[in-house]
């Protein structure tokens, strides 16, 4: 009797698939970054809409903004404070990563706009500012990272269609996702990334080790990787970051190995006497 086991088919309900909390970026078949880490569990979510209503033009009886007690300094919110209903609503938001606008990437490497619209060093904070300018509900998630852009943390979740109001457009000028991406690209082009973009004026909280006397610097590119030269301050690639500081430190000079002080062996003298 053969010991080979026959394959077993398992039925999976559509509801199970719809309820899975996954991001397509984690399963990108074109992944070319061999050291891209697994995305961590969410720890901090920053709301960019603390002053106006979170869901403009959407009936208030259908969507309720997050509770005020969940917010803290700089508009930071703890995602664990959201209700299950609010989490389901946030799942309807469109996810946007900075690498979608990176001029140094091909479409296979993550770029989603045409090359003439792409920019250098795109950041999630600037994308969030663009969405706010358009009057769209937006969340900036500082800890989320695209696996092909692991050194540039941050992503944006934006709602441009009122999915809870029969898909009504929040901004009539934004008919499709492609139009939304193109408008964001124009904003990024008009607001290029500089070192000030990651400085104290950016509004992004600094890690404790960078609270005092930290000056942002451009990072050198690593051969073979598509990466920003200006990254958020909480990136592992930031110069002087405790986790990666040794990568950029110059190697110490090794002293030349001295020759051992061994006395010379005298040469044997041979005297030849001719007869």
Swiss-Prot record:
Which GO CC terms are listed, alphabetically? Answer: signal recognition particle, endoplasmic reticulum targeting
List the Pfam families: SRP19
Under the heading Gene3D superfamilies, the entry gives: Signal recognition particle, SRP19-like subunit
Does the UniProt entry include the keyword Ribonucleoprotein?
yes
Q: Where is the composition biased (Basic residues)?
A: 265-275
- In which compartments does the protein localize? Cytoplasm
Q: Which domain of life is it from?
A: Eukaryota
Q: Does the keyword RNA-binding apply?
A: yes
Quote the biased-composition stretches of kind Polar residues, using this chain's numbering: 58-74
The processes (GO biological process) annotated in the record are: SRP-dependent cotranslational protein targeting to membrane, signal sequence recognition
Keyword tags = Cytoplasm, Ribonucleoprotein, RNA-binding, Signal recognition particle
Q: Which InterPro entries match?
A: Signal_recog_particle_SRP19, SRP19-like_sf
| Main location per the UniProt record | cytoplasm
- List the Gene Ontology MF annotations in alphabetical order: 7S RNA binding
- For the region Disordered, give the residue spans: 28-76, 249-275
Q: What is this protein's function? A: Signal-recognition-particle assembly has a crucial role in targeting secretory proteins to the rough endoplasmic reticulum membrane. It must be involved intimately in the translocation of a wide variety of protein substrates.
Q: How does it assemble?
A: Fungal signal recognition particle consists of a 7S RNA molecule (scR1) and at least six protein subunits: SRP72, SRP68, SRP54, SEC65, SRP21 and SRP14.
For this chain, the family text in UniProt reads:
Belongs to the SRP19 family.
Identify this protein by name. Answer: Signal recognition particle SEC65 subunit
